[in-house]
Amino acid sequence: MIILKDLAGGSHLPKNVFLDMVILSRKKLEDIPEERRHRLLASLKPKHIPKIWELTGTRYQDAKLAKQVASALLSMDVNSMPPEYWRCRTSKGPMPFSWLNDFRKAIFQGKDGSTYGRIILLSKLYGPLYFTVREVTEIISTEQPCDLVYEFGDGLLDLSEFPEGFPIPAKHPWPFNDHLVIYIRHAGPGVVVGQAWQEGNDLDQVPKKFCGEILMVKDYISSL
């Protein structure tokens, strides 16, 4: 069965073959029961994740694939839904941030109709790491295509209400307050892949990749 691991292993193939593999992989992902889909993370090595990012870039060559999304909340076109929870793994966490290699995220809709999220870490040093979700079409630094961006900002989300059990926002510590963003590509149902950048608040600051690429798989059975 071709799943993301097989897709990543085909990076030496021509781009038209990449696209065929992306289409087939998406169909295979649909065949995996939702409650078992998060197990994909355990089947992948960190080296596979950058290849998945690269290969999902071919999705934009197909008009139909380019419109497909990984989840309802990330479609940015819903009215009211409960939060979604995702399991995430990076290709390489920077030192001294190796604890960021595996984490969880939550996506939720605010009363204002916008979409937001937070990174959920085991470490309590960094508190609640909230972000805003926006639709974008390309990465600023590379001009590569993408679907969304997670913008961390200063962390002080001005919302009148948060999902039950969510902590009160707090000011982000460095480097999360240094215009940290994660660009997102839809990879398949319940699966997205991201690329994190520290773009910097200073105009003359050169953007740099933060923690490589990040594979994110929706967890259909977990909550906080």
Please tell me what each predicted stretch does:
Residues M1-L224:
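Soluble ligand-binding/transfer domains with enclosed cavities or grooves
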